[in-house]
């Protein structure tokens, strides 16, 4: 690909290969130059570090075509905890884009850092959002103790997104206040319908989430499929 200036590949699936950073860095350089952009990119479980993913996202941002062509982005199972990686991911997502399916599950991406970008660039096309097995924040303890607020963009995104059909925030240890903001945002959204919401394995029964569900879920009209399994509700 790197040696072909006229490469026509627009869909690339390298999932479950040991690409590592030494493989993704030259690929990133190529991504920055693809004249037709990229439509489908699956790099799940490729043993990438935050530095490698950060370089990739910087290249996708540099290539202006990708903002108007990339509809599928799967980075699941790679390590993306580094601040620079999160920054570059957010920079790409914050620009107007056409990403329809976004999977960054199991990447250690702090969700509270992500939603400002989603609100700015992903409210029109995004239909499938998989954020499972990520921490809501690396300051979750402060949020629980009331020392910090949930970012306003978190609720605003769910209130204003226009096409979302699937939301997976399972295994995220969502604080009760985050759950409340998510549900209230969806309750305000009159554009969505038939949404699937996965809240499984969030320990909602142990951290006040059950009370939030009881008080808020009745106002959420857009959700038709709700997964609350493995939450210790009622114990």
Predicted regions and their residues:
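Leucine-rich tandem repeat or coiled-coil scaffolds
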Residues: 1-235
């Amino acid at each position: 690909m790197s040696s072909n200036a006229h490469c026509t590949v627009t869909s690339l699936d390298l999932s479950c290969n040991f690409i590592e950073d030494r493989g993704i860095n030259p690929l990133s350089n190529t991504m920055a130059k693809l004249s037709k952009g990229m439509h489908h990119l699956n790099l799940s479980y490729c043993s990438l570090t935050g530095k490698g993913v950060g370089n990739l996202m910087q290249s996708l941002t540099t290539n202006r075509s990708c903002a108007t062509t990339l509809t599928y982005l799967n980075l699941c199972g790679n390590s993306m905890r580094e601040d620079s990686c999160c920054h570059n991911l957010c920079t790409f997502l914050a620009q107007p884009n056409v990403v329809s399916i976004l999977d960054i599950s199991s990447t250690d991406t702090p969700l509270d850092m992500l939603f400002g970008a989603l609100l700015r660039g992903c409210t029109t096309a995004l239909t499938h959002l998989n954020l499972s097995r990520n921490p809501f924040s690396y300051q979750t303890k402060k949020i629980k103790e009331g020392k910090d607020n949930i970012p306003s963009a978190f609720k605003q995104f769910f209130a204003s997104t226009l096409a979302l059909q699937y939301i997976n925030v399972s295994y995220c240890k969502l604080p009760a206040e985050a759950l409340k903001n998510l549900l209230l945002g969806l309750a305000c959204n009159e554009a969505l319908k038939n949404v699937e919401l996965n809240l499984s394995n969030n320990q909602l029964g142990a951290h006040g989430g059950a009370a939030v569900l009881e008080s808020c879920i009745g106002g959420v009209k857009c959700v038709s499929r709700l997964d609350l399994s493995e939450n210790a509700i009622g114990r």
